[in-house]
Amino acid sequence: MAESLIQKLENANLNDRESFKGQMKAQPVDMRPKTEDVTKTRGTEFEDYYLKRELLMGIFEAGFERPSPIQEESIPIALSGRDILARAKNGTGKTAAFVIPSLEKVDTKKSKIQTLILVPTRELALQTSQVCKTLGKHMNVKVMVTTGGTTLRDDIIRLNDTVHIVVGTPGRVLDLAGKGVADFSECTTFVMDEADKLLSPEFTPIIEQLLSYFPKNRQISLYSATFPLIVKNFMDKHLNKPYEINLMDELTLRGVTQYYAFVDESQKVHCLNTLFSKLQINQSIIFCNSTNRVELLAKKITELGYSCFYSHAKMLQSHRNRVFHNFRNGVCRNLVCSDLLTRGIDIQAVNVVINFDFPKNAETYLHRIGRSGRFGHRGLAISFISWADRFNLYRIENELGTEIQPIPPSIDPSLYVFPNGDYQIPRPLTASADQVLAAQQAKGQEGYHNRPNNNRGGHPRGGGNRGGYRQSNRQPRYRGQQKAD
């Protein structure tokens, strides 16, 4: 009798689950092969965590199929309220690992701030807040993003309304808390993404001060790919018997193929031009070590005839936001940037990362190459090495326990390109510059290409801070999709 009743209940739950799944507008299934970085799980499902139906609907409609290893380890512990120290590779689903339990624990009947998600950069704050809104779109959860570079008055006005989750950067959040505008007295969930950066000497005093505004029974969760000694010091001082998760059996992503090329400084642009003509690039990010070199390289790339945006920390925040938004939406194939975008930025269409300037340390290298090969997919990382970089190359290989191979005469496209057939992955627009401009103007946005002005020869418009280049005598061309030899 008991067994029969149990069977009926299981069948009822299964039918109920399938019925609500059938009502959703789910994303097409991602057919690209994935590595063990995201597939090596115990086989649990999101339904096994007994999440609210509205949250499950948001998860499945966003295209999530089943938990990745970091989500599988983190979600049940976070739901229990225990402090967490989680270490996992870039691009394996860390953001959803803390966003899902944060959304689940929100009580929408209360008008108080219940979760703070702290991140080190403004771009990452915008991206994380969007994940919160996407997954929680059926839950009536109010999410607010606050960062430096925006008007403090606007944040104060928004905090007069109900806010359940705040996503922000340390300085601005502390400013709001210090002014008594943001009330964290009932905020029991404190999440730090890219915790190693947030606990660096420049941010640690701010974090320490910010914690004084939280209740004693708060839950603190730290997520990152790397944890230096300073994180342990913070953990010993502020975390209560944290549950430690370490999924870093190796530091680099399995799906990212790494090469280096010995190149004289004077030949770097020529080498980059060769790569653009040979590689099958969906979208690429090119890293430089200084903001000045970012703009100079973006100009050179445009003069070669390739579409290019640039972004760095000295640009106005509104321009940085526009560049990031347009690049993410595929308006342009190539983005030149400083280390501003090394952390957490998730653009699924990026399959090639190029270190035009080789990074000085292993941590920066790890975060840079992690912009490709997101969520177990394939990617390619190529580093230009000068004679002065050879010692850094050897040291980074030793610290990461990986071997960066010399670049071969030809690169097998299967290492970083999915032979998609009829399946469509996010790809950059192939429209002409005029069509892109028309589409942007229809949305009330200012275009980057063919904007009338007196600048010539690829010089930046608007004083150099717009983040895009044009040429006076020819249209920017989309390349990078040519077949490799």
Swiss-Prot record:
It is found in: Cytoplasm, P-body. Residues 16-38, 437-485 are annotated as: Disordered. CDD domains: DEADc_DDX6 (cd17940), SF2_C_DEAD (cd18787). It catalyses: ATP + H2O = ADP + phosphate + H(+). A motif (Q motif) lies at residues 44-72. SMART domains: DEXDc (SM00487), HELICc (SM00490). A motif (DEAD box) lies at residues 193-196. The keyword Nucleotide-binding applies. Its EC number is 3.6.4.13. Residues 75-245 form the Helicase ATP-binding domain. It is an enzyme of class 3 (hydrolase). Pfam families: DEAD (PF00270), Helicase_C (PF00271). ATP binds at residues 88-95. One of its GO terms (molecular function) is ATP binding. One of its GO terms (biological process) is deadenylation-dependent decapping of nuclear-transcribed mRNA. Residues 255-415 form the Helicase C-terminal domain. Keywords: ATP-binding, Cytoplasm, Helicase, Hydrolase, mRNA processing, mRNA transport, Nucleotide-binding, RNA-binding, Translation regulation, Transport. Belongs to the DEAD box helicase family. DDX6/DHH1 subfamily. ATP-dependent RNA helicase involved in mRNA turnover, and more specifically in mRNA decapping. Is involved in G1/S DNA-damage checkpoint recovery, probably through the regulation of the translational status of a subset of mRNAs. May also have a role in translation and mRNA nuclear export. The Q motif is unique to and characteristic of the DEAD box family of RNA helicases and controls ATP binding and hydrolysis. This is Putative ATP-dependent RNA helicase ste13. It comes from Schizosaccharomyces pombe (strain 972 / ATCC 24843) (Fission yeast).
